[in-house]
Amino acid sequence: MSIYKIPLPLNILEAARERITWTLNTLPRVCVSFSGGKDSGLMLHLTAELARQMGKKICVLFIDWEAQFSCTINYVQSLRELYTDVIEEFYWVALPLTTQNSLSQYQPEWQCWEPDVEWVRQPPQDAITDPDFFCFYQPGMTFEQFVREFAEWFSQKRPAAMMIGIRADESYNRFVAIASLNKQRFADDKPWTTAAPGGHSWYIYPIYDWKVADIWTWYANHQSLCNPLYNLMYQAGVPLRHMRICEPFGPEQRQGLWLYHVIEPDRWAAMCARVSGVKSGGIYAGHDNHFYGHRKILKPEHLDWQEYALLLLNSMPEKTAEHYRNKIAIYLHWYQKKGIEVPQTQQGDIGAKDIPSWRRICKVLLNNDYWCRALSFSPTKSKNYQRYNERIKGKRQEWGILCNND
């Protein structure tokens, strides 16, 4: 896909319908990934309506994060009932999945539906709660792992589509996920498709070129069901760019934590008891607050950024600090091998693009970015984590980087 925008001879709604129609006609199995948000909701509306006209069946995947608004759960159930005639299988997944908890250094990861703890709410009776339902499922696997494995499992070794409602203008990472020149396409004239791991499924992005104004214009014109939580967010003064519906404790998502306190006080109380750091996150994680180093980061005047990073590491719980030391050591060694010394700061070093500096490392630590995504890391598989940790700890001694906690 070109990094330059090339105008199409049709509008975005016509283009989206054309892409969905092609998907339904070309691939025998189609699954819509649905979060309960405005984008995936619009995609589900379009896909289900076209499937109904064409006499086709679709499947839907919904990951239930346990700590979610009642509005969202009710909305998901409403769409499930609205399109029951075209939905062959609705995978309402309520299994333990691991994701970041960017609110606490004592519990930097959390599992939804974790066994033997008191949950924020109970899953629906027909939700998938049996770990043996999916042959690929491993207890505590990450959301990213689950979705990759699900795509291959769903294909049944035949061509299949996983429809994903992300938009390229939402973030740099989402733009790259679609536009990267390294992605394999179904065909050269299908730049809105990418190959899923496993070789049988294809990720389809039918609304990749929509803007947020286009989304709301469509809902206004068509009067289709939308998550009522957005109305509550609007009334609470939340800017459009911060209206997110997903798991609530990630680096970006935590900015909306305070809404639980306002909209659902009972659920808020359960979340505070369930997940470490939620109460402080509700106070300090707002989009205008610098507590977590979200936008602007400051350091003590008598320290440089490298010294500040070491101070932050030494102030953390030891287990969490060792995790970060291992990641940072790999990061520094990678540049060391290229003959590049990571500077204290450089222009653009705390933006979306990974421009190396000690200030960027400080931002990762302040942001509680446990998986170090801002340093271009992906989550380590939980079953390999302990062995990986010990191996990198030994490598640090060999490299002479961040050994002896200095």
Swiss-Prot record:
PANTHER family registered for this protein in UniProt: 3'-PHOSPHOADENOSINE 5'-PHOSPHOSULFATE SULFOTRANSFERASE (PAPS REDUCTASE)_FAD SYNTHETASE, TRANSCRIPTIONAL REGULATOR-RELATED
Gene from which this protein is expressed: ybdN
One annotated GO molecular function: catalytic activity
Biological-process GO terms, alphabetical: cellular response to oxygen levels
Pfam families hit by this protein: DUF3440, PAPS_reduct
InterPro entries: DUF3440, PAPS_reduct_dom, Rossmann-like_a/b/a_fold
Protein's organism: Escherichia coli (strain K12)
Protein name: Uncharacterized protein YbdN
Residue spans crossing the bilayer: none
